[in-house]
């Protein structure tokens, strides 16, 4: 019986990762602020989202949950940037609380979604609102992303 319960818990765990936030404070705003140079915090009290600004558009790291997008948008705009200028969406790792809203942010901004090759299988199973999770570019360890004079290096 114990073994069956453990297997059941393991089998159901991924669905919890892709679900909407169970905690209302996950969407509680936190003051947007500059971290250093062109890197800004635009997340919530419990969810870390970051904006890297460039003259050619911006990079959003962690779109979080779909219900969090209005908070992120407000944070971006409170810093004087346009949400629509997001050109690239990245995620720290393939969990719903970091990348579930990629499709929505892409729809709102036209941004390209990029993900590590190792995250692709989990992202393909992530279907918020029964939408396919977009992946425009698959990144390998050490690969570089360049935008507006800023270079990011993907690391696993």
Language model segments and positions:
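Bacterial N-terminal signal peptides
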Residues: 5-16
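Residue-level detector of beta-strand face positions
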Residues: 41, 51, 144-146, 153
